[in-house]
């Protein structure tokens, strides 16, 4: 059971800080090629944020726009983890170990509209550094290597509960939020090897929590997990990295087995499209696979040989760089069946590929656009979307 004293909260008053010219900031931020520490796409796939040695930056996902409320942004120092609130008013981040302003167990909330840090949460140091963070319109979650913390959000932020979890030093987890029902779920590795747990965060109280759904997905450790926005589908990949499995999160039944490849690979990230029709998976083999969930044949209809093969990807994109986050989008005033898949890469590059399903049922994809995110942010002539 959680205790009120487990996390410490601070509301941060506005600091007196020296004024800095935009010119000086632009010169400092373009000195060398940036390598990202983290990138994340919002739950509704409308925006994304990146973290590096210079702090964080916010962007509209598709079409790409740099999103900052003011030209001058407070110097937050190097950032290791970052998540953007879907309404683009708040950024949640954890400082980097080297040169960071705050401890590794401090969760900072930055108010973009006010252009200042206004809230700080400290998890107990005995649980180690924060390894991942998630935010939805009604819940805030932080994972430590062996502990999970859940708070109310965004108003009157209070800890609801903390739970022990399986050792998870990489913070492997995924959140879902259904805007229709406000249901919020979190998926993360279970205590049994190869299993995944799904917790209904709305059902958590300070006194009790319902037992999470447990799905035995693989024989080896979980490497990646993804939830669709309704929290009804969960996709899992193991350290072997050859097969992705999709389960019904309510019944725990297996739905689809998707074949990424035959050679062992490290899965970098995985994401469902907002419509739940597609699942994208990136690996260290330099490929981004996209599977058609609705086009894949359910497992129960396959014979033994077909099950061993698994369904193949409908689109395969070559990317010779690590992928940190995946998003889906659609550009306004384009054909209804034309959609986009976006990859945010570790070298601070943005890759958009377009795909569509033709009248014969086949999928076609082509390169859409490429951008260097730091250049986009520093280009004074680039259109900047105000954050309201």
UniProtKB/Swiss-Prot annotation:
One Pfam family per UniProt: PROPPIN
Extent of motif LRRG motif: 258-261
GO molecular function: phosphatidylinositol-3,5-bisphosphate binding; phosphatidylinositol-3-phosphate binding; phosphatidylinositol-4-phosphate binding; phosphatidylinositol-5-phosphate binding; protein-macromolecule adaptor activity
Sequence segments annotated as region (Disordered): 1-33
UniProt KW Membrane keyword: yes
Keyword annotations from UniProtKB, A to Z: Autophagy, Cytoplasm, Lipid-binding, Membrane, Repeat, WD repeat
Location in or out of the cell: Cytoplasm; Preautophagosomal structure membrane
WD-type repeats, residues: 217-257, 262-301
Segments for region (Required for atg-2 binding): 265-328
Coiled-coil blocks: none
GO cellular component, one term: cytosol
Primary localization: cytoplasm
Subunit record text: Interacts with atg-2; the interaction is direct.
Function: Component of the epg-6/atg-2 complex, which is involved in the generation of autophagosomes from omegasomes and in the distribution of atg-9 and atg-13 during the autophagy-mediated degradation of protein aggregates. Binds to phosphatidylinositols on preautophagosomes, which are early autophagic structures, to promote autophagosome formation.
Entry note about domains: The LRRG motif is required for recruitment to phosphatidylinositols including phosphatidylinositol 3-phosphate (PtdIns(3)P), phosphatidylinositol 5-phosphate (PtdIns(5)P), phosphatidylinositol 4-phosphate (PtdIns(4)P) and phosphatidylinositol 3,5-bisphosphate (PtdIns(3,5)P2).
Protein name stated in the entry: Ectopic P granules protein 6
């Amino acid at each position: 059971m959680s205790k009120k004293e487990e996390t410490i909260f601070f509301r941060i008053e506005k600091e007196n800080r020296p004024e800095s010219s935009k010119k000086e900031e632009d010169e400092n931020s373009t000195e060398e090629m940036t390598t990202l520490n983290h990138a994340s796409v919002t739950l509704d796939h409308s925006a994304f944020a990146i973290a590096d040695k210079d702090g964080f930056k916010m962007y509209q996902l598709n079409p790409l726009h740099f999103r900052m409320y003011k030209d001058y942004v407070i110097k937050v120092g190097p950032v290791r983890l970052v998540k953007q609130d879907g309404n683009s008013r708040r950024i949640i981040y954890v400082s980097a170990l080297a040169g960071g302003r705050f401890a590794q167990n401090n969760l900072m909330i930055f108010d973009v509209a006010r252009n200042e840090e206004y809230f700080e949460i400290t998890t107990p140091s005995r649980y180690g550094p924060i390894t991942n963070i998630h935010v939805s319109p009604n819940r805030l979650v932080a994972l430590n290597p062996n502990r999970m913390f859940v708070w109310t959000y965004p108003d009157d932020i209070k800890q609801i509960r903390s739970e022990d979890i399986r050792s998870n030093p990489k913070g492997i987890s995924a959140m879902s939020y259904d805007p229709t029902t406000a249901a919020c779920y979190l998926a993360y590795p279970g205590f049994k090897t190869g299993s995944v747990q799904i917790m209904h965060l709305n059902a958590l109280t300070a006194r009790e929590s319902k037992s999470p759904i447990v799905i035995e997905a693989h024989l080896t450790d979980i490497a990646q997990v993804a939830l669709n926005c309704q929290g009804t589908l969960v996709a899992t990949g193991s350290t072997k990295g050859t097969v992705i499995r999709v389960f019904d999160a309510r019944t725990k039944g297996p739905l689809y087995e998707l074949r990424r490849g035959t050679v062992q690979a490290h899965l970098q990230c995985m994401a469902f499209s907002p419509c739940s029709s597609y699942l994208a998976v990136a690996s260290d083999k330099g490929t981004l696979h996209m599977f058609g969930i609705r086009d894949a044949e359910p497992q129960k209809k396959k014979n033994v040989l077909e099950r061993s093969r698994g369904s193949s990807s409908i689109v395969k994109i070559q990317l010779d760089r690590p992928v940190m986050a995946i998003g889906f989008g659609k550009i306004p005033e384009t054909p209804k069946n034309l959609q986009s898949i976006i990859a945010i890469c570790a070298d601070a590059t943005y890759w958009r590929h377009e795909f569509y399903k033709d009248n014969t049922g086949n999928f076609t994809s082509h390169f859409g656009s490429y951008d260097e995110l730091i250049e986009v942010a520093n280009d004074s002539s680039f259109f900047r979307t105000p954050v309201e």
